[in-house]
């Protein structure tokens, strides 16, 4: 880890007040990082010191000893660190990952008594990126992490999956109407159909809130279905009441958690959840009137998140549609209206101007959502 220039008095205070994470036996050459910083581990590396208290994301990629250029998928985990706290972890050679099992208290205390001698093997937390990290995680609480992280706490760029059915024998394939192994595929689609259905290994999946696929209540009339398909407030309130009953603001913590898992953990499923959750928030006009503080904070979150991703990242390769501009276009048409809270309206107008100037995105055109909406009615309901 490269040396960081820091005022001696500040360094002394941080050494005694900051948290320390010790990671024993991490192999030389491993790509290791904390929050917005990453390094290649050297032979003397034992961890990170002077870490500010709060939520942090530690991530790493193992390296093939025979071919150091071969880097494994990124893995990571969240830690909630406290003032003067000491966390002791170990590298598992067998699993090639950090073992998150808590170290015995006696070992932790022995390590604490030896911190002065261990200091030379600990890299200092890079404070230059602390403000950026806080801006991306200020709504992620310890409770958010406990709720969303996988049961095994390891967040992996590639899902650990298993087949839904083992199908070890030919009779198992016949039972699923699948052709015998060895029979040549006649088309690409047939080849896809032969692939086994997969599911995440138990305990490895990020536990995101389930988002509704039906945006209207049971028994809704055709007019109500159309209304709830244009304004998703009913669906959003369903999520807030079920998942965040005591504090609707906590949905913003989940939005940030998903973004960090994608940005730093390289988890594509987290990006897809971020898009779906953002779409639900941005297309809920009635909810903006009720939860204006939540939406004021949402704008601040998006301001910092969008600064981390290239402008063309959200453009669909096939259709060339930009998910973000179309979603925010609907958001601004509601948030900039006279009916909403004045503070929210002013902040939305400033944010819109900022995005237009920075990314040259056009929010002036009428959004497609203003066109007539075609909705599929539930079975048994007919238009009057």
From Swiss-Prot:
Belongs to the AAR2 family. Interacts with PRPF8 (via RNase H homology domain). Component of a U5 snRNP complex that contains PRPF8. The gene is AAR2. Transmembrane segments: none annotated. GO terms for cellular component: spliceosomal complex; U5 snRNP. It holds the Pfam family AAR2. Keywords: Acetylation, mRNA processing, mRNA splicing, Spliceosome. This is Protein AAR2 homolog. The modification N-acetylalanine is found at residue 2.
